[in-house]
Amino acid sequence: MDLTPREKDKMLIFTAGLVAERRLARGVKLNYPEAMAYISAALLEGARDGQTVADLMHYGTTLLTRDQVMEGIPEMIPEIQVEATFPDGTKLVTVHQPIA
């Protein structure tokens, strides 16, 4: 399989997002990279499904709560920016205060 660097990045985010999803299902609190991957993967999938940028900006704030991440993680992630592929092209999705 010959992937571009961008495709490799997406695969890495998706794989790390799956690990984070499984840990959440077991009740394990997520660390910084896991929380970033979990939210980023969900945003990428939402874009692929055809959701709008505005919908994803709101959706990104509903994915994780403070109780699901380690102490101090919400403060470490004031925003997340993901370059996602939508049906009409690539757009930047910014989620402010993603962990409520």
Swiss-Prot record:
Would the keyword Transmembrane helix be found if you checked this record's keyword annotation? no
The protein's annotated pathway: Nitrogen metabolism; urea degradation; CO(2) and NH(3) from urea (urease route): step 1/1
Q: How does it assemble?
A: Heterotrimer of UreA (gamma), UreB (beta) and UreC (alpha) subunits. Three heterotrimers associate to form the active enzyme.
Catalytic activity field: urea + 2 H2O + H(+) = hydrogencarbonate + 2 NH4(+)
What general EC class does the enzyme of this chain belong to? Answer: hydrolase
> Which PANTHER family does UniProt cross-reference here?
UREASE
* SUPFAM superfamilies for the chain: Urease, gamma-subunit
Q: Which InterPro entries match?
A: Urease_gamma, Urease_gamma/gamma-beta_su, Urease_gamma_sf, Urease_subunit
Q: Which domain of life is it from?
A: Bacteria
> Do you know which Gene3D superfamilies this protein is assigned to?
Urease, gamma-like subunit
Pfam families per UniProt: Urease_gamma
Q: Where in the cell is it found?
A: Cytoplasm
* Gene Ontology cellular component annotations, sorted alphabetically: cytoplasm
In short, the EC number is 3.5.1.5
Query: Which protein are we looking at?
Result: Urease subunit gamma
In the record, the note on similarity to other proteins reads: Belongs to the urease gamma subunit family.
Q: Name one GO molecular function term.
A: urease activity
Its Gene Ontology biological processes? urea catabolic process
UniProt keyword Hydrolase, yes or no = yes
Which keywords does the record carry?
A: Cytoplasm, Hydrolase
Q: Which CDD domains match?
A: Urease_gamma
